[in-house]
């Protein structure tokens, strides 16, 4: 799934993964950067463009395919689509919700640098998974987590 409108995030699709993503259906929001579609087409990958619940599609009464709503991140969009497709076991891999112990915001091999967002926001201490220690996060990740938790409660 891709929601972002920027060229820098479209570059995630500018990689050749061979057969690994051959049978993947890439779901992109209607506001996705054109380069993302160009890269998907260039590698003959299947993709679907879905409008988000924004004012312009509502204004022009674009209802034929309905909308994605309450999807501020790829994780939210993926969860929403999984629920609509009646999937029962949904696993999130790689969702940003906390900094690594070394302060990195992303994995070492992240194309925009491991500390891409490390100094972008004020760090906040929060309870780590399992409740045995505290980790650093920031307000945007906490907001994303709260929306995701509300979605899980609503659709479970």
State each model region's role.
Residues 1-156:
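Metal-ion/cofactor- or nucleotide/acyl-coenzyme-handling active-site neighborhoods
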